[in-house]
A protein has these predicted regions:
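Short, solvent-exposed loop/linker segments at the N-terminal edge
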Residues: 19-28, 40, 113-120
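Extracellular recognition modules
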Residues: 81-85, 173-175
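Hydrophobic beta-strand residues of extracellular immunoglobulin-like
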Residues: 30-33, 47
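Solvent-exposed loop segments of extracellular immunoglobulin-like
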Residues: 37-53, 134-135
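Solvent-exposed segments in extracellular or luminal domains encompassing
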Residues: 59-79, 157
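Short, solvent-exposed loop/turn segments at the edges of extracellular beta-sandwich modules
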Residues: 85-92
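Extracellular interdomain linker/stem segments of modular secreted and single-pass surface proteins
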Residues: 1-7, 75, 99-109
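Short loop/turn motifs at secondary-structure boundaries
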Residues: 32-36, 100-176
Length: 176
């Protein structure tokens, strides 16, 4: 008997499933375990994990181990199928499918902010509903094209200063 299970974390909370990981955000690191039980001593299982993207009929990766891990970094759905063959047989039995769905990347930036110290819109940063962003780098330029600020942490942003001093109200450009 087998109980194939996927182990992963969302917001540092350990999770597990034996059927679907739905609408997760990239990057998502998942460990797949076959979890065999009640296998007699004369039986030697050979494991085969097949990773297939939705819309394809051929796996993009096959792993031959009882436990395997993969980091999902692209949006879309992937079927992870476990096949098991016994005692050097070439006929593998399909045991289970675990489907992993990664959401499409989403990044929204505000079109204005007011760094006046009132606690409302004081920092120019990505809106909180960002999803599946693997790499982030933003630059702020003044109207003459001079870079005045940049940051790489998607959860931080620009406070409206340059070299420690508040910049003049006006139009600034962001490149993400």
């Amino acid at each position: 008997d087998f109980n194939p299970t996927a182990y992963y974390s969302i917001d540092n909370q350990p999770m597990e499933t034996n059927d679907v990981i739905n609408d997760a955000q990239a990057p998502l690191f998942v460990t797949f375990k076959a979890n065999p039980s009640n296998i007699d001593a004369e039986t030697t299982p050979a494991y085969e994990w097949r990773f297939t993207k939705e819309g394809s009929d051929k796996p993009f990766m096959i792993r031959y181990e009882e436990e395997t891990s993969f980091e999902f970094i692209e949006s879309g759905s992937t079927s992870v199928d476990l096949y098991v063959a016994y005692n050097d047989s070439t006929d593998a039995e399909h045991i289970s499918t675990i489907k992993v769905s990664i959401s499409i990347s989403l990044l929204e930036m505000p079109n204005a902010f007011s760094p006046n110290g009132d606690g409302i819109n004081d920092i120019y940063k990505a809106k909180d509903n960002h999803k599946s962003i693997i790499d982030f780098h933003a630059y702020i330029f003044n109207r003459w094209g001079q870079k005045i600020y940049d940051w790489t942490d998607i959860n931080s942003g620009w406070d409206g200063t340059y070299k420690g001093k508040q910049v003049a109200a006006g139009v600034y450009f962001v490149l993400v």
